[in-house]
Amino acid sequence: MEKHFLIGLAFLVTLVSCHERTDKDISNKFIGTWTLVRCIAIQQDGTISFPYGEKPVGQILYDTKGNVMVEITNQEIKKFSSENPFLGTPDEIIPAYNGLLAYYGKYKILADSSIIVHSITASSFPNWVGQDQARRFEFKNNNLILRTPSISSVQYELTWEKIGKSK
């Protein structure tokens, strides 16, 4: 009886250890800086649009302490007539605001469900401050693909490429 208990206990410890190692392996894949390759909006009918233009730029950074920082911009936005960012006209400010998303906060990975949660501390979109934003993740080659849940009948898919050494 004691022998069976010890064998069962050893199996359980091995199983838990493998699960923890898998979570850590997935966690390590996120660490580093990623550059935005593509950002698309997918309507319910399958129509695709480009909310930050067809050639958006951006970076997402994940560090080992659970911090995340994101910036996405539309490079097609026209420059302001003034060099002072606070003196733009409404015709300059509106597209500039709509062509930018930036936030930072903490992240946690729910490896079993392939979800990463960004807990937002500050954001260019004020409604997200203090919220958790969940993203389904997938690693494909040297890319990280993040998908939002449906937001107003639209799902966003962002493809990021790892900068530097591949993990």
Regions of interest found by a model, annotated:
Residues 10-17:
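Hydrophobic h-region of N-terminal signal peptides that target proteins for export
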